[in-house]
């Protein structure tokens, strides 16, 4: 049994894992789920974590037991190991009595595990069961940082982060070919290259963006010693050509708002953008293989009176039910819906324009 420890956006991490398992043909069976981790029975390899954008740790579960039996467990020499605890803070006191190296906040970050070369064990509180085991794989934040900050062209205030781009690539389930028709500086293309997708098509209506993408993709090929066919050209996403297996993209999300606006203004912006998105989806229908996926980021505006969403039904496509393999009682208890918002704060403040991750299948 294994546990996958989620990043900050647990629903996004979960959606990525399920899509990744399906794409890679990983046979798995559900065991338990919390907002911190997914427990599964499966054949897992530690290197898998390098292919994921939203998983922080993989833990090999050695034992599981009822909450009330925590103090009866024999943890052997592991009591001298550093431990991370995911779940109820009410049980921290009991864990502290058993383990000598209990961190102040209850969790050792993946950054510290990599930086300080620490080996640890984890205790995960599920719905009714405790799961205990050794961490066998850790996501390396310095790899993502290199992929972001070392490339020649950067636009931190606008570009999607490499970890989020990798999640989009995995949600698309692309194996042989992928397209990003709003490529910007090429972050999604870069992650597709690192994922080993052999044919990558990038385009943008902005000629500067095309040049930026070319520079960044050339750098990525050299820096990570990757080969593959990468075609980058100036093109309007409303007039696509060619043929592709899947699309992963973050289109224009509208103006970068600094403060909340009225619902009327928010709907006006969303309405303008929706026209662009509809035209893109119509165009994509002609190049996307039947059954192929579009993994896309859409904007949600935090207006003064509440959230304003894009109308998410597009002709010729069906939304993918990302969580249908999660048992219904868990979906009900954890309030899992097909809406995945990335509301990570920006410089300590709530974002006005929030990313919504959506996946569609061509029919």
Predicted region positions:
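Class I S-adenosyl-L-methionine-dependent methyltransferase catalytic core
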Residues: 1-53, 58, 62-64, 89, ...
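Generic structural signal of hydrophobic/aromatic residues within well-ordered alpha-helices
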Residues: 48, 70-71, 95
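Short amphipathic alpha-helix with an adjacent loop that forms part of the alpha/beta core around
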Residues: 68-75, 239-243
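A short N-terminal interaction module
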Residues: 75-130
């Amino acid at each position: 049994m294994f546990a996958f420890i989620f990043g900050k956006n647990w629903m996004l991490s979960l959606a990525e894992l399920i899509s990744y398992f399906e794409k890679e043909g990983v046979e798995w069976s559900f065991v338990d789920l919390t907002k911190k981790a997914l427990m599964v029975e499966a054949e897992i390899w530690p290197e898998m974590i390098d292919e994921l954008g939203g998983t922080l740790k993989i833990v090999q579960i050695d034992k599981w037991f009822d909450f009330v039996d925590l103090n009866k467990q024999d943890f052997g020499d592991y009591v001298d190991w550093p431990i991370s605890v995911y779940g109820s803070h009410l049980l921290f006191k009991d864990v502290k009595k058993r383990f000598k190296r209990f961190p102040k906040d209850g969790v050792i970050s993946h950054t510290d595990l990599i930086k300080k070369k620490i080996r640890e064990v984890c205790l995960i509180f599920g719905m009714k069961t405790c799961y205990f085991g050794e961490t066998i794989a850790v996501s390396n934040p310095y790899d993502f940082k290199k992929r972001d900050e070392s490339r020649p062209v950067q636009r931190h205030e606008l570009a999607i982060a490499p970890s989020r781009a990798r999640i989009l690539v995995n949600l698309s389930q692309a194996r042989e070919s992928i397209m990003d028709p709003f490529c910007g500086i090429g972050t999604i293309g870069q992650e597709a290259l690192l994922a080993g997708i052999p044919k990558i098509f990038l385009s943008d209506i902005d000629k500067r963006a095309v040049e930026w993408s070319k520079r960044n993709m050339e750098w990525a090929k050299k820096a990570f010693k990757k080969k593959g066919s990468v075609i980058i050209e100036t093109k309007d996403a409303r007039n696509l050509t060619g043929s592709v297996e899947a699309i992963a993209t973050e289109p224009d999300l509208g103006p970068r708002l600094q403060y909340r606006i009225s619902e009327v203004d928010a709907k006006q912006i969303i309405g303008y953008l929706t026209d662009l998105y509809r035209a893109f989806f119509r165009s994509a229908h002609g190049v996307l293989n039947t059954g192929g996926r579009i993994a896309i980021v859409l904007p949600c505006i935090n207006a003064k009176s509440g959230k304003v969403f894009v109308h998410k039904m597009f002709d010729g496509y069906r939304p993918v039910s990302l969580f249908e393999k999660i048992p219904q009682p868990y979906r009900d208890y954890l309030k899992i819906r097909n809406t995945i918002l990335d509301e990570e704060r920006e410089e300590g403040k709530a974002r006005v324009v929030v990313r919504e991750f959506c996946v569609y299948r061509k029919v």
